[in-house]
Structure formats: C-alpha cells, structure tokens
C-alpha cells in the first residue's frame, strides 16, 4: 500500500470502534510526517492569541503554550459521537502515563477544542476529570476566530474546504513540536502509545 493511499485511509476511514484494529495496523506501518520549515516557526508566525484553560486560566498561544517547550498537540470536541474521539483520547491518556512525571516538566500536552461554543472551561474541566488526566495536559478553549487561527498555524487544516468543515477530519492526528530547536512531527493519533512516545523523544532530541 503506498503512502498516499495510507493517508487517505487514515483520514477518511469510518471511526467506529470496530474499525480500531484496522486503524492500529495501518498506524503501525505509517511513517510520521516531519515538518521542517525553512525559516522556522516562531512567535511572529504562531501569533499570541488569548485562550483559556479548563480552569479558566487565561493563556497566550505562543508565549505560554509553545515558547521554549516540547509539546504534544491535538484537536477534539467533548461532544464527539462518531466513535473516534473517545478512542483517541484514551490513547493519549496512555501516552501521558508513559511520560510519567515528564509530562508538565519536559513535555506539555494540549488539547484544543473544535467546538468553543459548547466546550466552556467548566465542561472541559469535567471532561478532563472523567478521563483521569494528570498534570501537564491542558484543555483549551477561546473565541472561535482565535482557535481557527491556532488550528491553521498548527497545520490542522485540509485543502478541500468541504473536508475542512468536517470537524472529525481534524481529530485523528497529533502534532509533536520542539519550539526551541524547531523540530516538528505529525503522527496519526491512533498510533500505539509506545510509538508516540518514541516520536516525542525524537522531537525532544533524546534519541536519533
């Protein structure tokens, strides 16, 4: 199976729980997409838009979330009912457990909502508690126009406007970034947690 066909399957395959074994098999054979811009991604590119965490704490997109950090980022919505979001979230919970006390110290995890009108800080906090998320993983909301800029700057967009409007199309990937050293890599979110950890370590410069 060629890479183009694989990416198409990862983006478009129905996300019911019964499809999980197929998706996992595809993910294990996939190669992460390395992103290395010519001039680098810094504050003037990302912008410094205001957001809020699940606790209602105001933060700035670049200064507080990205600058000087190694990060793992994905987009979601708490009201997702297509079967994919809960599986992805549990996969990322397992990733956080593998990180242990590195999460919030060496690596910071961020989940940006795709539905800010629904996902208030209080709702995000309850959702986070239900997942059993530990420290170092922030759930973020804000004004839709600001979140759309964040989504575009982070590369969670599709060239086809019709597909880009499908919020489910943006929940099946995770972006790893090392802002100080300008290393960025994207992987399918249903890749085994151990493999995702390996990608974080590569981006962080802990292994070749």
Predicted ranges, named:
Residues 50-71:
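A short beta-strand-turn-helix
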Residues 65-85:
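Short active-site neighborhood of thiol/selenol oxidoreductases, capturing the structured segment around
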Residues 88-110:
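Conserved helix-turn-beta segment immediately C-terminal to the redox Cys motif
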Residues 20-48:
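N-proximal helix/coil linker or "cap" segments that precede and/or mark the start of modular domains
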Residues 106-119, 136-145:
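Thiol-based oxidoreductase modules, predominantly thioredoxin-like and allied folds used
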Residues 5-25:
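N-terminal export signals
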């Amino acid at each position: 199976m060629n890479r183009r066909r694989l990416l198409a399957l990862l983006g478009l395959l129905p996300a019911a729980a019964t499809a999980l074994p197929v998706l996992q098999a595809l993910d294990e054979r996939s190669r992460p997409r390395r992103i290395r811009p010519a001039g680098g991604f810094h504050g003037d590119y990302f912008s410094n838009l205001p957001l809020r965490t699940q606790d209602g704490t105001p933060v700035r997109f670049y200064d507080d979330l990205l600058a000087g950090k190694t990060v793992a980022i994905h987009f979601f919505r708490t009201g997702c009912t297509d079967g994919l979001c809960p599986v992805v979230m549990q996969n990322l919970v397992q990733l956080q457990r593998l990180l242990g006390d590195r999460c919030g110290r060496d690596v910071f995890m961020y989940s940006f909502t795709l539905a800010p009108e629904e996902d208030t800080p209080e709702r995000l906090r309850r959702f986070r508690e239900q997942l059993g998320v530990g420290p170092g993983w922030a759930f973020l909301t804000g004004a839709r126009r600001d979140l759309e800029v964040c989504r575009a700057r982070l590369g969670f967009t599709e060239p086809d406007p019709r597909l880009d409007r499908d919020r489910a199309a943006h929940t099946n990937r995770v972006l790893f970034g090392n802002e100080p050293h300008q290393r960025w890599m994207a992987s399918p979110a249903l890749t085994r947690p151990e493999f995702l950890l390996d990608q974080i370590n590569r981006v962080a410069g802990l292994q070749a």
